[in-house]
């Protein structure tokens, strides 16, 4: 998946934009950082819609309850999606509200 493939929507609770990309069994939630143009926060959810930390994506020393990756660049977001695609073997698809 390329950056240009990600489909954006208005965030329902803020002035941010958001996108969700499904790569079974995971969903990647991407939200623009409102006060940091060009940066994004990323969360990964499992099939039960629970936040998860994945090895190779989240830093090893991450607090297990700190599951949102803040201040990610476009390249880092695409890298996260590609890593999940590699882990799962499934093609990433946009999810619409």
Regions found by a protein language model. Give the residues of each.
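Mixed-charge, Lys/Arg-enriched low-complexity segments
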Residues: 3, 45-97
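Membrane-helix boundary/juxtamembrane interface motif
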Residues: 17-19, 37-45, 50
């Amino acid at each position: 998946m390329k950056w240009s493939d990600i489909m954006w929507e208005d965030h329902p609770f803020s002035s941010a934009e958001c996108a969700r990309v499904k790569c079974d069994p995971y969903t990647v939630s991407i939200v623009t950082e409102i006060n940091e143009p060009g940066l994004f926060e990323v969360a990964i959810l499992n099939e039960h819609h629970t936040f998860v930390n994945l090895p190779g994506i989240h830093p090893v020393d991450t607090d297990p309850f700190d599951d949102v990756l803040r201040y990610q660049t476009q390249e880092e977001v695409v890298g996260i999606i590609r890593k999940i695609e590699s882990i799962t073997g499934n093609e990433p698809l946009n999810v619409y509200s």
